[in-house]
Amino acid sequence: MFIKIHSGAISGIEAVEVSVEVNVAGGGIGLFIVGLPDNTIKESEQRIQAAYENSGYRLLAKKIVVNLAPADLRKEGSLYDLPIAVGILVATEQLTSKFIEDSMFIGELSLNGELRGVKGVLPLVAMARARGLKRVFMPKENVAEGAVVEGVEIIGVSSLVELCEILSERMPYTPAEHVISSVDMAEESLYAEDFADVKGQAYVKRALEIAAAGGHNIIMIGSPGSGKTMLARRMPTIMPPMTLDEALETTKIHSVAGKIGAHRGLILERPFRAPHHLTSQVALIGGGTYPQPGEVSLANNGVLFLDEMPEFGRNVLEVLRQPLEDRHITISRAKYSVDYPANFTLIASMNPCPCGYYNHPTKECTCSAASVHRYMSHISGPLMDRIDIHVEVTPVSIKDMSSERREESSADVRCRVVSARELQRQRFEGLDIHCNAMMNSSMLRRFAPLTKECSELLERAMQRLNLSARAYDRIIKVARTIADLEAKESIEPQHLSEAIGYRSLDRENWGR
């Protein structure tokens, strides 16, 4: 007897349809799984056999061939345990059900027949809906994630026995309630941190506000204990709330990476990823024998924070250049390649020198000019070229620390950021960009033209401050964002002056 069960496989952050074809015939005994399975799938024979024995079913002494089609697509993971087990039961006439043809099955079987959660559920359910399937059977711990997708019934089961009872219509089922319609995308109480927690540092907070408003990458240079990490961790709290599309994309990435905990659904808060400086290239950009998303993709639609940036290996930092420029990462293997989104805001921090006290107001730096220069050279020019804002962070004074003055909250800053982003959305409507940081040179001439006064100001600054040529476009982009924060139609001299002040590391005399 032949039977076909619907399932799926993950490719990048999307899913493709996989048919689990089961054929039972004479002429031998055994279970044979074909169709480019990995070792996890090959081991499913033992899990399925034990689950049958502990659930009251039998693996008949016949030749059972399971084909995972299409055969040229690599399949991996334990999510095929359930569709294979159901297919064998139907093909051996131990189970009959009218639900098979229009249902998808995903889940890992334990030896006692219970179901365990799997990763990649959200893209799999989205694919099931696109294929016109009516329902998806899955482990209960994945239900909250699956219920993000509307238009398909999500049915959580705890064991093989419970599933068979439902399929045989001996037990009623209640589909999970879909969560999208009840989600408030503008919810502001998602974060525990707040800008109001940080005393002083108005100059740095202003720079972070500009970075959030225009999607600009930013680097903070300051001595140890000046508050760089504390400020960086509060960046997501002032960024605009994620749109539904952004939330779905973010959830898909974390789902594929297996980073969504049990019983968790749509991710609403912007990601904040802070990899250790010993992180490898693969961990940072993604990869592996079977590619998985790296930190740059897990930070998609959020923040990637590189604390003490010069401590990262130079080869590790250099691989950031492609995702910073293209906002996605391509991982190639011999026979295929996968793309992962990598549209993140980079926040980097660093000490100004090896000892950490160059330009400190009270402590003396013990580093030579040459050692400061060598330390700064750990970050290459092409990588620094992709960072729009450089801001020096000075230690908070005792006066500011003891002040009772109420600091501005993240909600207040976010209101201005959202207004500026709305202006940019209108400006770039119909284009494939959505914020000022994404403009190229031709777009700058169109959307951020300079008056004669501003052009002369920028030219004088380039000469007097010895700014490098690569700073020119960056300054204009940041100035355009500053103008947006003030709801100004054109860039004015004060906007340009402030933007020029955010190019500390471009000055040729830095560290000398």
Residue ranges and their predicted role:
Residues 40-45, 58-60, 67-77, 290-291, ...:
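Basic, amphipathic alpha-helical bundle interface domains used for macromolecular binding and assembly
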Residues 1-219, 223, 332, 472, ...:
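Peripheral, non-AAA+ core regions of ATP-driven protein-machinery
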Residues 220-261, 326:
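Walker A/P-loop
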Residues 171-210, 214, 241-296:
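P-loop NTPase nucleotide-binding/switch module
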Residues 112, 306-313, 356:
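Catalytic P-loop NTPase motifs of RecA-like helicase/translocase cores
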Residues 59-62, 99-100, 132, 150, ...:
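Short loop/turn elements that form and flank the Walker-type P-loop nucleotide-binding site
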Residues 301, 307-308, 319:
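Walker B catalytic acidic pair
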